[in-house]
């Protein structure tokens, strides 16, 4: 009997290992998504107040009656920076329909202010610094990952959460706003 395996046997073995690795990756990510959508997250948004870039204390209930996209982000987070131009465009387009983006920056005022000016951010940004991670956990981000977004309906109920980049399609689907 040949103690060396044929190239076909090696290829099949490698293929099976790759399939197992892909399956394990998908199961892990599916569990992560399910963990974020468990019953531990309150259906109604938690209340909070934070200072904006001008130092004014803003309360989340100021935006009651609107669809809210609450986005936890930081200037040092590349995926956070990537999604902001889309948020700027959506805020401009859907503001008349009652869609309100609110940034919750896990950063200091100076860095956020400079970045907001450079990018032309047209929606409120609240400064949470490191305390923002705990606030994000109250909204269901058990991993402390950024970016993290929460979509809240007009009645103040959490209707969606997203760890990582939030797509325009998901926002429009959950808010039932129409894309022209």
Model-derived features with residue positions:
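Thiol/disulfide oxidoreductase modules built on the thioredoxin-like
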Residues: 117-122, 128-176
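Structural microenvironment flanking redox-active thiols in thiol-disulfide oxidoreductases
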Residues: 81-120, 130-137
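Conserved redox-active cysteine motifs that mediate thiol-disulfide chemistry
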Residues: 64, 72-89
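A short beta-strand-turn-helix
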Residues: 47-68, 94
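N-terminal targeting signals for export/organelle localization
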Residues: 1-47, 180
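Conserved hydrophobic/aromatic "anchor" residues
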Residues: 48, 72-73, 115, 123
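Short pre-active-site segment immediately N-terminal to redox-active cysteine/selenocysteine motifs
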Residues: 66-68, 72-76, 108, 145
């Amino acid at each position: 009997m040949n103690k060396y395996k044929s190239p076909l046997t090696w290829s099949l073995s490698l293929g099976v290992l790759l399939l197992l690795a892909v399956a394990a990756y998908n199961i892990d990510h599916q569990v992560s998504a399910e963990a974020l959508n468990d019953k531990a997250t309150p259906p109604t948004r938690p209340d909070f107040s934070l200072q904006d870039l001008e130092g004014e204390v803003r309360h989340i209930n100021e935006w009651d009656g609107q669809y809210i996209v609450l986005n936890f982000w930081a200037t040092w987070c590349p995926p956070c920076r990537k999604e902001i131009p889309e948020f700027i465009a959506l805020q401009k387009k859907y503001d008349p329909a009652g869609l309100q983006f609110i940034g919750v920056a896990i950063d200091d005022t100076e860095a956020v202010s400079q970045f907001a000016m450079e990018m032309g951010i047209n929606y409120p940004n609240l400064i949470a610094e490191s305390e923002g991670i705990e606030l994000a956990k109250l909204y269901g981000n058990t991993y402390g990952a950024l970016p993290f977004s929460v979509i809240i309906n007009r009645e103040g109920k959490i209707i969606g959460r997203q760890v990582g980049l939030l797509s325009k399609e998901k926002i429009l689907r959950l808010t039932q706003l129409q894309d022209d």
